[in-house]
């Protein structure tokens, strides 16, 4: 079998969750961090397909958990983007680089805050020192994303409170100089405005 065929077999095993085939490829000396055309490694593919046993085995075998594909995905960012708490709990103990950026320049907590992934946000704040005031490429913090890019409902209110309780700065503005409080009021998100006021906004 050629090296390319071995890589193809290895990546397919990760996609399908075939742990025995995965181990066999590793035993044959496949490059554990080999990628497909999208620059996806086996651990990225396994993460996207919720093949948790393969993710665990690849971490134990020394896979690079921080390597990112063409769309900036890696296992940690996938867990934050897709609300995959199981994956997050597998990846966090392996010590992922929390400063790796999504394609929009956010850190993991940024899309999780935007999308209303309450449990992911809670876990990140409890277990990591991820930067809650990180500003992405369009000038938004996780707090601003949680307000502007969703519906202001119960999940978003909970995320705003979690962020504020864990050091999010209620005064950091967007690139046009608008504060979280102004933006919440513009959108008619009264409950979020109250949370911001209570935090000193």
Question: How would you describe each model-predicted region?
Answer:
Residues 56, 60-114:
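A generic tandem-repeat structural signature
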């Amino acid at each position: 079998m050629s090296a390319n065929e071995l890589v193809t077999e290895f990546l397919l095993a990760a996609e399908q969750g075939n742990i025995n085939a995965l181990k066999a490829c590793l035993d044959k000396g496949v490059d554990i961090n080999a990628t497909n055309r999208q620059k996806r490694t086996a651990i990225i593919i396994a993460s996207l397909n919720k093949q948790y046993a393969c993710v665990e085995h690849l971490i134990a075998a020394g896979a690079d958990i921080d390597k990112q594909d063409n769309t900036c995905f890696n296992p940690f960012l996938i867990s934050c983007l897709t609300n995959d708490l199981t994956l997050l709990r597998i990846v966090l103990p392996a010590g992922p680089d929390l400063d790796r950026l999504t394609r929009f320049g956010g850190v993991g907590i940024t899309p999780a805050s935007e999308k209303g992934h309450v449990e992911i946000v809670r876990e990140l704040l409890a277990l990591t020192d991820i930067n809650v005031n990180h500003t992405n490429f369009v000038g938004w913090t996780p707090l601003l994303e949680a307000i502007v890019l969703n519906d202001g409902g119960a999940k978003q209110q909970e995320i705003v409170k979690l962020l504020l309780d864990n050091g999010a700065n209620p005064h950091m503005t967007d690139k046009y100089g608008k504060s979280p409080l102004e933006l919440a009021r513009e959108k008619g998100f009264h409950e979020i405005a109250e949370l911001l006021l209570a935090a000193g906004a």
